[in-house]
Amino acid sequence: VKAAAFVEQFSQLQASAILRTNDQRKAALAMEAAIRGGFRVVEFTLSIPGAYELVQDFCRREDLIVGTGTVLDAHDARLSVDAGAQFLVSPAVDESMIRAAREMDVASMPGTHTPTEMLQATRAGADMCKLFPAPAGGPAWVKGVLGPLPDIKIVPTNGVDEHNASEWLAAGCFGVGFVATLF
């Protein structure tokens, strides 16, 4: 999936399942549960032992869009794409990761927490901005940021659950990420 195609698909699906655990088997089982629950965009953080192997395994399924999280630099980005990752997520803004993603035509979503970081990431070529951690004020904060920065594609991945996801989306978020809150 090319970067632009992923952005378009994510704009339709609007939700991803994100797994962070210290057990590869548990990660696979939990992701299967998320998929049974309807998720089609799935993310394995690189902190999971065997994360690249999980990406390879889940990429074999044509009904899924599989990415990696905790991508900290260009090296992680290349290894992720070599394993089959179709999008890259980071907890912080690393311009080498964003550049590598652009060179490979893979969507990047660096972690941001302030409007300044969001603008920096977007200007560096990021396709979306992961909002991490969720700020006090939640959806109202997002609405405030999107007033002067309406083109920023904000995706909160912390503090989102089945009870408030619609509030985040109504505030203008491009999508939301569920970090093991549902499964």
Feature names for model-found ranges:
Residues 39-44, 81-83, 102-104, 114, ...:
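Glycine/Thr-rich beta-alpha phosphate-binding loop at enzyme active sites
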Residues 1-86, 103, 151-154, 162-163:
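Conserved N-terminal beta1-alpha1 strand-loop-helix module at the mouth
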Residues 46, 70, 91-93, 112-114, ...:
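Short secondary-structure boundary segments
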Residues 73-119:
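Helix-adjacent hinge/juxtasegments
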